[in-house]
Structures are given as structure tokens and as C-alpha cells.
């Protein structure tokens, strides 16, 4: 059996009461104090996540922008230095290699932050499709990454840095930011639906920053709450809402797919055809009317006929209802449409509802 990968924070997990699980080959905390308490901490105060398992890929060289325009679905030319952009990397079929965030450090240097389990696959795909004068380097082992999320994130982080955090706009970032004596990159971004920051630092210093933030009274948060938080906010998870068989259009990520950009990106032709023909299926929110929790891969029925499948589901800690996302036949995606979810050997009533399930007050 292959030994599980560990983040630089791993030696500290036991000290804070982490229960760990195998997550895509990594030994990561599923919870500390408990999923509901952790979820609530992020929604009402702040919580700290170890996300050092995420991959970082460095793209450098004079042709970096045109290469990324070819590789990715969003319009890379629109990114200003010091800003980030959400992106999809597609196969020629329009299916998804990965979803990721691109950070523009200079006109000739970008960092791509990718899903942990996809890092090697993404890197190989990027090298295979290299164009022009660019270098592509997997620098994942060099970085630790923490996410401080919640309405009080700015107030807490400002105690540990001289950077004026209020000047960092959403998806903006600053480099060489001192946090607890460590040189970091601070980005105003996250995966929870709350305000917050993602902080990148040398791997060797990650534990120091982690403990400095926790010392401000912040709760450590595990993967369980990370999933319930992102699901309430309807943020896609690769392997569930996106995959090689699910296109970004089907997943409702049109905002990150610029079919009108001049550059021909990989998958563009297939996505244009899919859009012109009309989507056969799309991602919708569902709320259960009867008791039961929808889970990944549970079938969705209408009048005994299967019309789709659940991609993610949970009991919403914030709303106190059972919610899910489902990829279903476009003909049955009207709001209020009643459907049934196959839970074990029973069909449970549900209805299609607006998303996101949760949106923070600005």
C-alpha cells in the first residue's frame, strides 16, 4: 500500500485534535472539533484550513500569456498583474481536465493553483500542450497554503501583518507580505462563500504561520466543513460537478468560458457546438421535501424514469435543510419541478430550487 502524502502542517494535526482520512492520496483532517461547529465558526467568525495539498504550477516565459490563452477557457489577457482569475482546463471534447485559479505575477510569469489529486495529470497535460517560449514547472512541494475564511478574517489577519488588507480586492493578491515574520503571498479568495484570504508561504514556514493564526483564537477547520461550506455556496468540486465527462457549460460555469475570445483554446470548438445544439443536461440545486440526504451518484427520477444524478449533497448546517446539486435532463430543470432521489432502496421527494443555497451579506 502506498504511503499517504502529508502536508507540512501534518505534524501539528494531533496537537489540535484532528481526525484524518485518505483524501485523494493525502492524509488530511476531516474534522477537528466537529463538522457543524467548524462550519458555523466560518459562517459567523473565522476558521483556518490547511490547503497545502493543493498543487502549484509555475508558467514563465515571453509566450506565457498566449500559451495560457490556448490552454484555458477564460480570457487570460484580461488579468492584470496582482490579480487572479478562475479558469477551466478542457479536453478537446469539452470535458474538464481541471478547474483552477491563475495568479498573474508579471507579464511573463503566472502561478496556476490546481486541485491536489489532479496536480500530476494537469502538469503532464500542460507539458504535452506546451506552445512557444515558455517553461512549465511543478513547484507544489515548495509551497504551504492556508485559507483563513469568515467574516472576521480580515480583522484577525491584520493583527499578524502590516499589509493594508482592506486594499486587496476580491481575487487580488500581494506578494512579499510579512505574516508572523514569514514572507507570504496573500490572496483575497477562498472556497467557502465567505470573505477570506488564501496565504502561500515556503513549506518550511507553514507550521509557524498556522500556529500564529490559531493563537488569535481561530478554529482549525477540516475537509468535512470545507465541503458543506462550498456546497452551500455552490462552488464546484472536481470529480463531482466537473469531470472529463462533464463540461463547464453543463456545470453552469459559463462566466469562466469565453467562447468569443480570439484565441482558440483546447475544447473551444466542442463547447461552441454544445452551446449551439443546446445542453442536454445541466446542474441544478435540489432541496429534499421528505427525509433523507442526497449523496454523490444517487439517481434522480421523474415518473419512474431516471432523469439525472446527484453530484453532491449534504444536510446544510446553515439552513437546516437537506440540499444537493444534480446534473439532470434540461427538460426538467424548471424551478419548483418536483423530482425523486433514489436513496438506498427508496425514492424520496425533492424539488428544484434556486442557487446558491447560501449567499453572504455584502
UniProtKB/Swiss-Prot annotation:
The glycine cleavage system catalyzes the degradation of glycine. This is Aminomethyltransferase. The glycine cleavage system is composed of four proteins: P, T, L and H. GO terms for biological process: glycine decarboxylation via glycine cleavage system. Keywords: Aminotransferase, Transferase. One of its GO terms (cellular component) is glycine cleavage complex. The gene is gcvT. Belongs to the GcvT family. It comes from Listeria monocytogenes serovar 1/2a (strain ATCC BAA-679 / EGD-e).
Amino acid at each position: 500500500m502506498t504511503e499517504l502524502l502529508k502536508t507540512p502542517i501534518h505534524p501539528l494535526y494531533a496537537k489540535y485534535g484532528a481526525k484524518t482520512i485518505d483524501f485523494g492520496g493525502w492524509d488530511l483532517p476531516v474534522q477537528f472539533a466537529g463538522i457543524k461547529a467548524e462550519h458555523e465558526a466560518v459562517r459567523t467568525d473565522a476558521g483556518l484550513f490547511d490547503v497545502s495539498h493543493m498543487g502549484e504550477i509555475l508558467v514563465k516565459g515571453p509566450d506565457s500569456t498566449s500559451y495560457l490563452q490556448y490552454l484555458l477557457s477564460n480570457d487570460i489577457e484580461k488579468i492584470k498583474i496582482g490579480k487572479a482569475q478562475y479558469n477551466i482546463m478542457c479536453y478537446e471534447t469539452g470535458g474538464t481536465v481541471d478547474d483552477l485559479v491563475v495568479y498573474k505575477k508579471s507579464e511573463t510569469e503566472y502561478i496556476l493553483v490546481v486541485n491536489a489529486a489532479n496536480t500530476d495529470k494537469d502538469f503532464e497535460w500542460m507539458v504535452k500542450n506546451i506552445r512557444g517560449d515558455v517553461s512549465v514547472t511543478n513547484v507544489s512541494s515548495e509551497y504551504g497554503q492556508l485559507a483563513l475564511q469568515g467574516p472576521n478574517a480580515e480583522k484577525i489577519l491584520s493583527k499578524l501583518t502590516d499589509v493594508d488588507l482592506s486594499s486587496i480586492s476580491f481575487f487580488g493578491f500581494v506578494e512579499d507580505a510579512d505574516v508572523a515574520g514569514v514572507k507570504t503571498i496573500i490572496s483575497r479568495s477562498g472556497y467557502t462563500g465567505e470573505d477570506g484570504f488564501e496565504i502561500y508561504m515556503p513549506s518550511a514556514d507553514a507550521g509557524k504561520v498556522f500556529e500564529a493564526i490559531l493563537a488569535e483564537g481561530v478554529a482549525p477547520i477540516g475537509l468535512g466543513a470545507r465541503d458543506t461550506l462550498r456546497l452551500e455556496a455552490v462552488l464546484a468540486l472536481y470529480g463531482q460537478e466537473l469531470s472529463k465527462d462533464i463540461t463547464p457549460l453543463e456545470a453552469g460555469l459559463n462566466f469562466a468560458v469565453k467562447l468569443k475570445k480570439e484565441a482558440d483554446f483546447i475544447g473551444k470548438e466542442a463547447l461552441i457546438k454544445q452551446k449551439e445544439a443546446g445542453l442536454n443536461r445541466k446542474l441544478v440545486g435540489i432541496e429534499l421535501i421528505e427525509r433523507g440526504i442526497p449523496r454523490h451518484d444517487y439517481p434522480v427520477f421523474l415518473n419512474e424514469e431516471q432523469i439525472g444524478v446527484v453530484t453532491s449533497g449534504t444536510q446544510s448546517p446553515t439552513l437546516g435543510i437537506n440540499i444537493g446539486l444534480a446534473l439532470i435532463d434540461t427538460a426538467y430543470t424548471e424551478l419548483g419541478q418536483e423530482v425523486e432521489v433514489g436513496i438506498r432502496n427508496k425514492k424520496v421527494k425533492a424539488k428544484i430550487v434556486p442557487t446558491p443555497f447560501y449567499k453572504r451579506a455584502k
